[in-house]
């Protein structure tokens, strides 16, 4: 069963061409985190990103707005329609996963298992924070690098494998990270366009001379 089939469907080409900001109702980061600049994504204590997610299967295709807040202990993933209506919210915190979709709440110890069970999607939510920032996990095999030693293609070792292509790169929040990724697994295709990525620091750890940078002012 796919509880997300009612999401607004648009051709995938609009995902690639869209460069506009998300709607004004975008989710704000927690108040105890402050935007900062970093010289490498690995130096970010936490981050948030906004962009687009396009999904294509053998039977269907659609796209949504994507918001992600990430720390070492917590993830908040939100999908919204093009009108800004939240249709899916996934939160993980220290071994607990909570999924809210279609007005119902589901819980599990494993976020990947929960998302697959409820939506029918096998989206790699555990690995995506690394891939979004252009990094590999210990279980990933690097297949191709570009001239700047950045990953161009990787494959996961767990069957059936995911194949990830890093199509283009960009500078955000002082660091270099992917702009467009494509993920393939059997008949499932995902494209993620990162429109905005912001490094965050816990407010009580921020040096007094650290300049603030708000995401909605970029």
Curated annotation (Swiss-Prot):
Any single Pfam family the record assigns to this protein: LolB
UniProt KW keywords: Cell outer membrane, Chaperone, Lipoprotein, Membrane, Palmitate, Protein transport, Signal, Transport
One GO CC term on file: cell outer membrane
Domain of life of the organism encoding this protein: Bacteria
Membrane protein topology class: Lipid-anchor
Compartmental location: Cell outer membrane
SUPFAM superfamilies per the UniProt record, alphabetical: Prokaryotic lipoproteins and lipoprotein localization factors (SSF89392)
Keyword Transport: yes
Main subcellular localisation: membrane
InterPro entries per record: LolA/LolB/LppX, OM_lipoprot_LolB
BP GO terms, sorted: lipoprotein localization to outer membrane; protein transport
Signal peptide (from-to): 1-24
S-diacylglycerol cysteine-type lipidated residues: 25
Disulfide cross-links: none
Lipid-carrying residues in chain (N-palmitoyl cysteine): 25
Subunit-structure text: Monomer.
HAMAP family: LolB
Function: Plays a critical role in the incorporation of lipoproteins in the outer membrane after they are released by the LolA protein.
Family of the protein in this entry: Belongs to the LolB family.
Protein name as annotated: Outer-membrane lipoprotein LolB
Species for this entry: Shewanella sediminis (strain HAW-EB3)
Gene: lolB
């Amino acid at each position: 069963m796919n509880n997300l089939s009612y999401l607004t469907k648009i051709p995938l080409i609009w995902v690639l061409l869209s460069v506009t900001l998300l709607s004004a109702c975008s989710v704000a980061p927690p108040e105890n985190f402050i935007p900062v600049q970093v010289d490498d994504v690995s130096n970010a204590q936490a981050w948030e990103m906004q962009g687009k997610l396009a999904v294509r299967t053998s039977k269907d295709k659609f796209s949504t707005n994507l918001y992600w807040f990430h720390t070492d202990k917590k993830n908040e993933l939100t999908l919204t329609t093009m009108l800004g209506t939240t249709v899916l919210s996934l939160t993980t915190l220290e071994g607990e996963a909570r999924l809210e979709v279609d007005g119902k709440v589901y819980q599990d110890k494993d976020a990947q298992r929960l998302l697959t069970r409820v939506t029918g999607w096998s989206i790699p939510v555990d690995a995506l924070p690394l891939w979004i920032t252009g990094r590999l996990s210990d279980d990933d095999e690097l297949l191709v690098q570009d001239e700047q030693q950045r990953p161009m293609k990787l494959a996961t070792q767990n069957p059936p494998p995911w194949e990830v292509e890093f199509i283009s790169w960009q500078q955000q929040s002082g660091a270099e990270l992917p702009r467009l990724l494509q993920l393939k697994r059997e008949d499932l295709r995902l494209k993620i366009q990162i429109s905005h990525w912001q490094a965050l620091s816990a407010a009580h750890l921020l040096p007094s001379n650290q300049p603030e940078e708000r995401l909605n002012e970029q």
